[in-house]
Regions:
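Gly/Ser/Thr-rich phosphate-binding loop
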Residues: 239-293
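Conserved pre-ATP/AMP-binding loop-to-beta segment of ANL
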Residues: 3-8, 18-20, 125-143, 174-181
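Conserved C-terminal "lid"/linker of ANL adenylate-forming enzymes
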Residues: 350, 391, 416-455
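Conserved AMP-binding A3 loop
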Residues: 33-34, 131, 139-166
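Conserved AMP-binding/adenylate-forming core of the ANL superfamily
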Residues: 2-3, 12, 19-50, 156-159
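Conserved AMP-binding/adenylation subdomain of ANL enzymes
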Residues: 162-180, 188-227
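AMP-binding/adenylate-forming catalytic core of the ANL superfamily
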Residues: 331-425
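Conserved AMP-binding/adenylate-forming
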Residues: 45-86, 179, 183-187
């Protein structure tokens, strides 16, 4: 094993630097070293200083181009805006949040609005010197849909990101020595931003420029010198048909990873995934490896928690502001001072005909049936009446039962089973069978696509 590279914070990384030939990013056909990276950042930074736009939205499909844009914006004194995705309509919806759109060629080719290409301003000049960044003065805005589905702006400082990256290196750095980073998640969100771009840069680990998108690619790119940054959206699509191949480490975040999916990943990759629990608002809160069902979550260092009257987690964290308590909607059970079990989201409680209904509980009851592998339950208004509908993924036994009974009798059977636990008002009135629940690359449910199943 080679001697580990020194770890540097985001604020001091460019001041300390790396060896000129140190590899920063790679793809199948090329790689970029520290010398070219710093020249590219300096070149774009000088161009950005000439613009009057104080708020710049950064969108890139290529993670190397994204990293160039990110640090060029830091050093040019711009406020950084990171849209959650770069679909034209989504960017138009956020247009009031930024004054200039900075993107790479792949993103730009799909846009109708004005933009500046990162690659148009890059040149390989002489090595540049960089000052220390003032981490509390570099501000970026990320977006989360939350429970409403409407993008919500979340402000972060470089200081808060540095605080979280230092914890990640403290917890996991030793097992990632000599590793390079492959990923299936977007850097436009906090998890991918930290795990696939900024943390690797601070630790001197090369990262892939593009995403892996299919289970077959995960197997093909696996090696015992590669760490995988992924999500339940892709990990649960792995099947026994995929050949086993080891990773040095596997991370998962963005949504719940079932115990079965965790065990299957262990079988395929010789690594039980490290699951990370947190949000855009809170940053990382806790982690776990599911060596058994209902493995509790272990709090990250530096985070204090308590439960409110509804048993929802309150936390105080340096990744937020370090002083004030932040209230979450995550119902928990503390099993020790630093460990807890997640019970579900209380903001997924709705009122139907004056009764409080937990959508999480309805899904849990569906998922416990032998015929259902996974479900999602959402409220919908039909004929001026609010009701519940469910999209379900069947097990092989469920598919056989549906074929045997037919849809009408199958739905009646489901409702009959649910009546053992749920009041009639809480039982979904309509169902759709799907091959998989619609999720984005972060493992978040695509509510709009689920709603379209019932139109």
């Amino acid at each position: 094993m080679s001697h580990p590279l020194p770890f540097h914070s985001l604020a001091t990384l460019f001041h300390h630097g790396r060896a000129p030939r140190h590899q920063v990013a790679f793809s199948l056909n090329e790689h970029h070293d520290w010398s070219s990276f710093t020249c590219h950042v300096h070149s774009l930074c000088e161009q950005l200083k000439q613009t009057e736009a104080p708020r710049v939205a950064l969108c890139a499909a290529n993670s190397y181009q994204f990293a160039i844009g990110f640090f060029a914006l830091c050093f040019s004194g711009k406020a950084i805006v990171l849209p959650g995705n770069y679909q034209p309509a989504a960017l138009n919806e956020l247009s009031c949040e930024f004054d200039l759109l900075l993107c790479d060629e792949e993103v730009g080719s799909h846009l109708r609005q004005a933009y500046q290409l990162i690659s148009d301003t890059l040149s390989a000049g002489k090595p540049a010197s960089f000052p220390h960044l003032l981490p509390e003065q570099v501000v970026l805005t990320l977006f989360t849909s939350g429970s409403s589905g409407t993008p919500k702006a979340i402000r972060k400082t470089l200081q808060q990101l540095d605080s979280e990256i230092a914890v990640l290196e403290q917890l996991f750095g030793q097992q990632l020595q000599d590793c390079r980073i492959e990923s299936t998640v977007s850097h436009q969100h906090i998890y991918g931003l930290l795990f696939r771009v900024l943390w690797p840069l601070c630790a001197g680990r090369a990262f892939a420029q593009t995403n892996l998108e299919y289970p077959e690619q995960l197997v093909a790119h696996a090696s015992d010198h590669t760490a995988l940054i992924s999500s339940p959206a892709l990990l649960k699509r792995l099947t026994s048909e995929h050949h086993s191949s080891p990773f040095a480490s596997v991370f998962s975040s963005g949504g719940p990873l079932s115990y079965e999916a965790a065990m299957h990943a262990q079988t395929l990759f010789s690594q039980t995934p490290w699951e990370v629990f947190g949000s855009t608002e809170t940053g990382g809160i806790a982690c776990r490896q599911q060596h058994q069902a209902n493995t509790p979550w272990q709090l990250f260092p530096g985070i204090d928690v308590e439960l409110n009257q509804e048993n929802c987690l309150r936390l105080r964290s340096p990744h937020i502001d370090g002083e004030n308590w932040y209230q979450t909607a995550d119902e928990c059970e503390m099993v020790s001072e630093r460990q807890f079990l997640l019970k579900g989201r209380t903001d997924r409680v709705i009122k139907l005909e004056e009764k409080r209904i937990s959508l999480v509980e309805v899904e849990k009851r569906l998922d416990h049936l032998d015929w259902i592998n996974e479900s999602v339950v959402i409220p919908m208004t039909e004929s001026d009446r609010l009701t519940l509908v469910a999209a379900i993924v069947l097990t092989s036994a469920g598919t056989a039962k549906l074929n045997d009974l037919g849809k009408g009798k199958f739905w009646l059977m489901l409702r009959g089973e649910l009546r053992q636990w749920l009041e009639p008002i809480a039982i979904p009135r309509r169902y759709r069978v799907v091959s998989e629940i619609p999720l984005n690359s972060q493992g978040k449910r695509l509510t709009n696509q689920i709603e379209q199943l019932f139109h």
